[in-house]
Amino acid sequence: MLTTLIYRSHIRDDEPVKKIEEMVSIANRRNMQSDVTGILLFNGSHFFQLLEGPEEQVKMIYRAICQDPRHYNIVELLCDYAPARRFGKAGMELFDLRLHERDDVLQAVFDKGTSKFQLTYDDRALQFFRTFVLATEQSTYFEIPAEDSWLFIADGSDKELDSCALSPTINDHFAFHPIVDPLSRRIIAFEAIVQKNEDSPSAIAVGQRKDGEIYTADLKSKALAFTMAHALELGDKMISINLLPMTLVNEPDAVSFLLNEIKANALVPEQIIVEFTESEVISRFDEFAEAIKSLKAAGISVAIDHFGAGFAGLLLLSRFQPDRIKISQELITNVHKSGPRQAIIQAIIKCCTSLEIQVSAMGVATPEEWMWLESAGIEMFQGDLFAKAKLNGIPSIAWPEKK
């Protein structure tokens, strides 16, 4: 199947520009052997390349390109399929934008085309060419430094509850996972994540439960989360708990129960965040919305967890605006390498900024992911790069320090 792949990257500062023609000559021979053709644009600092050919060969060559130390900030913009090649003259043809007038350069690029139809802007792949040549999207291109530009040093602040303080009859426990602002070295909140024992009643598969049992167990388990938060002496830190959306609907006294447990553990509603997962079906939305009103009227904040991973997404956001959203790890992973993920996350940030909704990123695992997200405007993060969730305690936090 004929595959089209487009990426952009940044040449290393210490890489001689004069060697680019030699590099292209080698790539041309290699690509032709794999039945891959394409064109490489260069503007003095950035590469923009289109590859066309059999899917496996294109992806094999792209993997090799990603390992090439002569460039960095490699971002895949497009991987699509087409009936015919657009640029089929050579395995790799270099087009130096610096040698052409700005007004003429696009037509000069199109003149390189080999399609039997004249290349036009209706072609999605060629719209990427226009954007690169005219530099109309520079504000969305973030040049992040190498991953080894930062050290992450644990602060030794971990704490664990004495096992004697935990009742042996308790079936569920909680792990606490911090949400942090790394550059200001500030803890935003601790998320209490339930850890279920295999023999726990609340660990029984949903299909094996009696009607309503899952929601009762979901609600009642939060009493332990508040008890542990109090025992860990989290002070005035925000505490985030997770609820199934339908728990608020099926448990009529859910809000009163939460408020009573918050008070019993010397906490205040204003430091509590209730998270709902976007992917859960909210079949009785009006009743859910009424329960949300009660939560917010009591001072409790509301967040959508795993935003972007479910099917409700923007429709849910149009009907219900939380105080916070947490962008799903599925969108965060390798965001520094993926043009589509970058565009989606930037759109989420812009939308939430317009609605004054705070945004955090979850599942951040690498320095590159964090640096790109910081550049995009996100300040709050959760993930193993900074700290892993700690069972019955709070973990040390690895704060970034510039080398």
Curated annotation (Swiss-Prot):
PANTHER family, per database record: BLUE LIGHT- AND TEMPERATURE-REGULATED ANTIREPRESSOR BLUF, CYCLIC DI-GMP PHOSPHODIESTERASE PDEF
Organism annotation: Escherichia coli (strain K12)
Pfam families named among the record's database cross-references: BLUF, EAL
Comment text on domains: The joining helix is required for stability of the light-adapted state.
Full protein name: Blue light- and temperature-regulated antirepressor BluF
Keywords: Chromophore, FAD, Flavoprotein, Photoreceptor protein, Receptor, Sensory transduction
Necessary cofactors: FAD
Induction: Expression is strongly activated by cold shock (over 30-fold at 16 degrees Celsius compared to 37 degrees) at low temperature in a PNPase-dependent fashion. Repressed by RpoS.
Disruption phenotype: Reduces expression of ycgZ in the presence but not the absence of BluR. At 16 degrees Celsius, reduces expression of genes (including ycgZ) for several small proteins. While the BluR/F system is induced at low temperatures under blue light irradiation, it is not essential for growth under these conditions.
Function: Binds to and releases the BluR repressor from its bound DNA target in a blue light-dependent (470 nm) fashion. A shift to low temperature also triggers a BluF-mediated relief of repression by BluR, suggesting BluF may serve as a thermometer. Blue light may act to increase the affinity of BluF for BluR, allowing it to be released from its operator. The protein has a reversible photocycle, and undergoes structural changes, probably in the EAL domain, in response to light.
InterPro entries attached to this UniProt entry: Acylphosphatase-like_dom_sf (IPR036046), BLUF_domain (IPR007024), Cyclic-di-GMP_PDE-like (IPR050706), EAL_dom (IPR001633), EAL_sf (IPR035919)
GO molecular function, one term: flavin adenine dinucleotide binding
Alphabetized SUPFAM superfamilies for the sequence: Acylphosphatase/BLUF domain-like, EAL domain-like
Cofactor note (record): Binds 1 FAD per subunit, non-covalently bound to the BLUF domain.
Assembly, per entry: Monomer, it undergoes transient dimerization following photoexcitation or upon temperature reduction, with a relaxation time of about 2 minutes. The dimer may be the inactive state. Interacts with the N- and C-terminal domains of BluR. Can also interact with the C-terminal domain of MlrA.
Gene Ontology CC terms: plasma membrane
Start and end residues of each BLUF domain: 2-93
Disulfide bonds: none
Gene: bluF
Organism ancestry: Bacteria, Pseudomonadati, Pseudomonadota, Gammaproteobacteria, Enterobacterales
Domain of life: Bacteria
Region (Joining helix): 98-144
An annotated GO BP: response to blue light
